[in-house]
Amino acid sequence: MLHWGPKFWRTLHLYAIFFSDTPGWKEKYEAIQWILNFIESLPCTMCRHHAFSYLTKNPLTLNNSEDFQYWTFAFHNNVNKRLNKKIISWSEYKNIYEQSILNTIEYGKTDFIGAWSSL
């Protein structure tokens, strides 16, 4: 069985964290296109369907990085709820992704993915 989920989430959360705090229309458009292409590339047909359905019901919020991060956080929790996995709080998300990703960039560590890999 291919375990692509943790890598998908890591990439999605990274994109949101590094999204601009003052995006222009072009950056917002590119983010929307990136998300659509990313969802389309999911290896699981049912997952693609669920992701597009979630996006339709919960449009992207691209006012700034924090809004985009919150959207990815809510999306991840939505999937975890459907899969009967752990739901995390916003503060847990911030701790897992923001701080861990910054540490990864600074120190070249990659072990942070384990924090949510079993969720």
UniProtKB/Swiss-Prot annotation:
GO CC terms: host cell cytoplasm; virion component
Induction notes from the record = Expressed in the late phase of the viral replicative cycle.
Residue ranges of domain ERV/ALR sulfhydryl oxidase in the record: 1-97
Catalytic activity, reaction form: 2 R'C(R)SH + O2 = R'C(R)S-S(R)CR' + H2O2
Q: Which Gene3D superfamilies match?
A: ERV/ALR sulfhydryl oxidase domain (1.20.120.310)
The EC number(s) given in the record are 1.8.3.2
Q: Name one Pfam family in it.
A: Evr1_Alr
This protein is called FAD-linked sulfhydryl oxidase
Per the UniProt record, the source organism is African swine fever virus (isolate Tick/Malawi/Lil 20-1/1983)
